[in-house]
Structure formats: C-alpha cells, structure tokens
Amino acid sequence: MGNPARKTFRAKRDSRRAQTFKASLPGIVECPQCHEMKMAHRVCKNCGHYKGKEVVSVEE
C-alpha cells in the first residue's frame, strides 16, 4: 500500500472538505398577498398571511 508523500495540513484538508458541507440558500419566495419576499412555509412578517389566511394580525 502506498504511503502519503507529504503531510496534509489542516487548512488544505478543511478547505477541500468545505465543498461537502456548503450551506444551501434558504427558500425565499414572494408572498402572494403583499408581494414581499418571505421564507417559504412561514407566516409573512409584512402582512401576517399564511396559505391565503390571515394568521397574525399586523399593525401598520
């Protein structure tokens, strides 16, 4: 079996592994009620609607 020719340093090893653990962007969608950007599957912070119903009353 072959042996490593050179020591692999922590920085080189970790930067190589970084592509595996790269975080994906959160799902950001447009609210159908107020057309503001919001997280998917969450109540809109701007208008308080979720799935076409007003869940939270928002004071303006």
Swiss-Prot record:
Keywords: Ribonucleoprotein, Ribosomal protein. One of its GO terms (biological process) is translation. InterPro entries: Ribosomal_bL32, Ribosomal_bL32_bact, Ribosomal_zn-bd. Transmembrane segments: none annotated. One of its GO terms (molecular function) is structural constituent of ribosome. GO terms for cellular component: large ribosomal subunit. Belongs to the bacterial ribosomal protein bL32 family. This is Large ribosomal subunit protein bL32.
